[in-house]
């Protein structure tokens, strides 16, 4: 494929995704004009409209996070607490209360089933793209959707997720709140008629604000939005500042309504040096193994269980809820997000949340229960979300990683009691390490878990486990829409074509110097026709008496001259030549060469010396240009920097 064809096809492609325009009412048009004028006046030179809009997006994302949590707390209070008499352990931000199991048994089956049914009816009736965990929809909108999210999707996603989680579904909050924030960012960008690239950035800024607020992790939220797009250690660096601005405002807005206390309270822990690293490396191995199982179960249930079932899509989440209820009859801990169970079972309760006969920060679950819950959570999360239910995967991943880390910590503590290992430290590191592997977001995981716990003393083991798990699990991911790197993103392909070609010089490409058709300027037309008939060339180079390049002509010029047969005997090569000659020098970049090839509409272009436009060096064929581009792209994907031209 010729790159110019690719460019022409790729540049307007984002416009094809603008299937949904903003409302055309007079009020919306007027609002758009007002905001456009304000944004234009306040835009900082060099920063642009995205910088001005990001705080506004963060404000709405923060309010969305507050509304989401309030609605979820209300549903949990009336359904799980009131109807099922099910009280989970409090998280670090909660208040002490007794822990109870749900009853009666038939309601444990009925409530998640009805929740799945209601969620499925809402989603598949009004916004089918809101099914699942939501983050993939955000990633897809960035890479392939031009930053477009339908206006109804955030609302439908939020309502359906509140119902799913509030009725016991095993799902988290990051997917819904990311879509709520991203949806407003996309809407505002459409309202202001921003470019596709600006729309993508505002969409990410909205996601960052929502995630940063709801998890009390503003830096982690900003990193998440930039990092979750790619499978490798890459991130959308252009979005970092907008995401930071949005996350700061969203977190501050959230703090006006809900005290931003740490979600987990951990004891004073310290990393004691090199001797502990092998122990945490074992945790990374465990995280990689369970992470592989988690991804296989998650998509295996979708592809081989729920898809083949001959039921309407609206009904399948109810089936997932019923199956979850069957497991919850024996293990109610797998219902909802379950952060409180991680605090109580794997870390231990702080003094402020202790129940009678409990010791401070003493994990209340043994190795067997912790491992059982970690494995069962992989199944129940798949039953909830892979059936078409609505909710995120970060919460369940934190649950699985925390339980797995707590189990590994207790096991190692029992094997090596003299080392005085802290199982709570392994639980905290397991949360971040596990999510880093399944989501391919190591920096996010390190910062998010540290901020959620308000503790940065375990940064070194967190870095180790996240890094090792990333390396061990590079072949699978929980987010199907991720691409390996920006080079592979449709959102950046046009940029990379231009950027890569601008990095390469004509001197780095094979220029043909033999077999050229040099035609003296005074050559008669009859001789020209004879030479053309015997040649396989398509571009003919006209030279003067000194051998300097003075023009070029093509087969089309010959055909045009033949139409005026009465003048043909008087025509010489100099009459056919195009002037001024479009050439490139050895010092020109390949992007310049591509543009001139396109202007001439030919396969080859003359290459001349940099200091003498008449001194012909050879011909550059577009085939060699494409080959150089392909080689450079492959080199950029290669881990060996020496392979880059």
Cite the ranges covered by each PLM segment.
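Alpha-helical transmembrane segments and immediately membrane-proximal extracytoplasmic
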Residues: 1-503, 507-515, 520-528, 537-539, ...
């Amino acid at each position: 494929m010729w790159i110019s064809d690719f460019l022409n096809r790729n540049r307007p492609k984002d416009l094809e995704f603008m299937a949904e325009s903003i409302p055309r009412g007079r009020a919306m048009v007027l609002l758009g004009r007002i905001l456009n004028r304000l944004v234009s006046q306040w835009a900082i030179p060099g920063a642009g409209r995205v910088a001005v809009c990001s705080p506004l997006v963060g404000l709405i994302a923060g309010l969305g996070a507050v509304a989401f949590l309030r609605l979820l707390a209300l549903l949990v209070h009336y359904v799980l607490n009131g109807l099922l008499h099910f009280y989970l352990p409090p998280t670090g931000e909660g208040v002490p209360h007794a822990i109870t199991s749900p009853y009666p048994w038939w309601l444990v089956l009925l409530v998640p089933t009805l929740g799945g049914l209601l969620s499925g009816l809402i989603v598949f009736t009004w916004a089918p793209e809101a099914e699942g965990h939501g983050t993939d929809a955000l990633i897809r909108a960035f890479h392939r959707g031009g930053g477009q999210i339908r206006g109804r999707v955030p609302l439908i996603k939020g309502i359906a997720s509140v119902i799913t989680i509030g009725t016991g579904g095993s799902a988290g909050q990051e997917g819904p709140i990311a879509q709520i924030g991203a949806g407003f960012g996309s809407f505002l960008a459409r309202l202001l008629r921003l470019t596709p690239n600006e729309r993508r950035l505002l969409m990410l800024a909205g996601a960052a604000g929502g995630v940063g607020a709801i998890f009390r992790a503003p830096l982690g939220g900003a990193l998440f939005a930039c990092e979750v797009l790619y499978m490798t250690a890459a991130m959308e660096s252009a979005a970092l500042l907008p995401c930071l601005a949005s996350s700061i405002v969203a977190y501050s807005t959230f703090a006006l309504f809900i005290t931003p206390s740490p979600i987990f309270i951990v004891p004073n822990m310290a990393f004691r040096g090199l001797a502990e690293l092998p122990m945490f490396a074992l945790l990374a191995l465990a995280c990689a193994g369970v992470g592989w199982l988690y991804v296989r179960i998650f998509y295996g249930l979708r592809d081989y269980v729920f898809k083949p079932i001959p039921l309407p899509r609206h009904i399948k989440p109810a089936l997932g809820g019923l199956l979850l209820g069957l497991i919850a009859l024996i293990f109610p801990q797998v219902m909802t997000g379950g952060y409180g169970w991680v605090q109580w079972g794997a870390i231990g309760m702080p003094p402020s949340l202790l129940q009678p006969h409990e010791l401070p920060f003493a994990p209340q679950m043994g190795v067997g229960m912790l491992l059982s819950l970690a494995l069962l959570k992989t199944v129940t999360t798949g039953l909830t979300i892979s059936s078409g239910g609505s909710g995120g995967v970060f919460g369940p991943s934190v649950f699985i990683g925390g339980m797995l880390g707590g189990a590994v910590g207790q096991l190692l503590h029992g094997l090596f009691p003299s080392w005085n290992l802290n199982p709570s430290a392994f639980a905290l590191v397991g949360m971040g390490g596990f999510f880093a592997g399944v989501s391919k977001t190591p920096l996010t995981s390190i910062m998010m878990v540290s901020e959620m716990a308000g503790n940065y003393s375990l940064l070194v083991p967190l870095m180790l486990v996240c890094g090792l798990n990333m390396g061990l699990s590079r072949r699978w991911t929980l987010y199907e829409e991720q691409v390996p790197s920006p080079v592979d993103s449709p959102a950046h392909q046009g940029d990379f074509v231009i950027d890569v070609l601008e990095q390469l010089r004509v001197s780095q490409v094979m220029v043909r110097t033999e077999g050229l058709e040099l035609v003296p300027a005074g050559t008669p037309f009859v001789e020209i026709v004879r030479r053309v008939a015997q040649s396989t060339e398509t571009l003919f180079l006209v030279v003067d008496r000194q051998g300097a390049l003075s023009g070029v002509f093509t087969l089309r010029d010959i055909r045009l001259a033949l139409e005026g047969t009465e003048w043909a005997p008087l025509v010489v090569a100099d009459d056919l030549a195009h002037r001024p000659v479009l050439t490139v020098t050895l010092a020109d970049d390949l992007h310049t060469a591509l543009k001139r090839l396109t202007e001439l509409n030919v396969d080859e272009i003359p290459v001349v010396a940099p200091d003498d436009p008449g001194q012909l060096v050879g011909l550059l064929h577009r085939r060699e240009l494409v080959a150089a581009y392909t080689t450079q792209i492959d080199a950029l994907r290669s881990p060996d920097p020496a392979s880059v031209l």
